[in-house]
Amino acid sequence: MKPKAITVLSGGLDSTVATSIYANDYDITAITFNYGQQSIKQELKHAKMICEKLDMKHIVIDLPWLKEISNSSLTTDKSIPQPSDNDLDDYDKSIETAKSVWVPARNTVFCSIALSYAESIQAKIIIVGWDYEEAVTFPDNSKEYLKSFNETIKYGSFDDIEIKAPLIDMTKEDIVKKGHEVNAPMNISYSCYVGCDTHCGVCESCKRRKRAFTRANVTDYTEYEK
């Protein structure tokens, strides 16, 4: 019998590849969080497709209160930033965009809930899609945060559970290459902040996705509006 695992699955590129790395060796249950984000309809649709592809159980946890206390452009009617291609490598511009889409303590909330569920079903690991490129602007994607949260688990759980972030040292380009290597269903992943039926192509998440496939020289089957 395979050991159990939990994955925090948004349906995006990163979480899809991270999950796929462990798919053959673990009995995985995927959790998708609904915190009122604009893209939730598409996230749920694509996360379900990914779970069917990888033969995983899928549960959805609603967090309406997180939307109520958040001022993020992801959960309000504020405009989502549309950075230029050059802005993606401009630290100050990237920080500005990150602050606009930042949902305070989101990963802390997600990991705490995932930990609770993992302990209840005796899962050994929690899989997350945190990566190097996003850690530059999002502190809760960093190695330091990962180490600190795993240290917290040691003191806050009866079980030996560990958060695994296999992409923590990877850029988006590296992630696409890894996804291609492990046959991750990247073609059915969804990255857009806006939540259109097709990727908008102009939000930061879409632009980083497009650039990653191009740089990795891997065919991108994503449909973009622009």
From Swiss-Prot:
Family membership noted in the UniProt record: Belongs to the QueC family.
Reported function: Catalyzes the ATP-dependent conversion of 7-carboxy-7-deazaguanine (CDG) to 7-cyano-7-deazaguanine (preQ(0)).
Organism: Methanosphaera stadtmanae (strain ATCC 43021 / DSM 3091 / JCM 11832 / MCB-3)
Protein name, as recorded: 7-cyano-7-deazaguanine synthase
Residues noted as binding Zn(2+) in the record, renumbered to the chain: 192, 200, 203, 206
Keywords for the protein's UniProt record, in alphabetical order: ATP-binding, Ligase, Metal-binding, Nucleotide-binding, Zinc
Residues binding ATP: 9-19
Pathway the protein takes part in: Purine metabolism; 7-cyano-7-deazaguanine biosynthesis
